[in-house]
Amino acid sequence: DCLPDWFHYEGHCYRVFDEPKKWADAEKFC
């Protein structure tokens, strides 16, 4: 199960952020 406002995809939880980020930046941000 994912936290509220997060969605489940292929065994992982994701969240959409208002500000665009590159994958590398997103990984560091998480």
Curated annotation (Swiss-Prot):
Keyword Disulfide bond: yes
Tissue expression pattern: Expressed by the venom gland.
GO molecular function: peptidase activator activity; toxin activity
Cellular compartments per GO CC: extracellular region
Applied biotechnology: Used for quantification of normal prothrombin (CA-1 method).
Domain C-type lectin: 1-30
Reported function: Calcium-dependent prothrombin activator. This protein may activate prothrombin via recognition by the regulatory subunit of the calcium ion bound conformation of its gamma-carboxyglutamic acid (GLA) domain, and the subsequent conversion of prothrombin to active thrombin is catalyzed by the catalytic subunit.
Name of protein: Snaclec carinactivase-1 regulatory subunit 14 kDa chain
Organism taxonomic ancestry: Eukaryota, Metazoa, Chordata, Craniata, Vertebrata
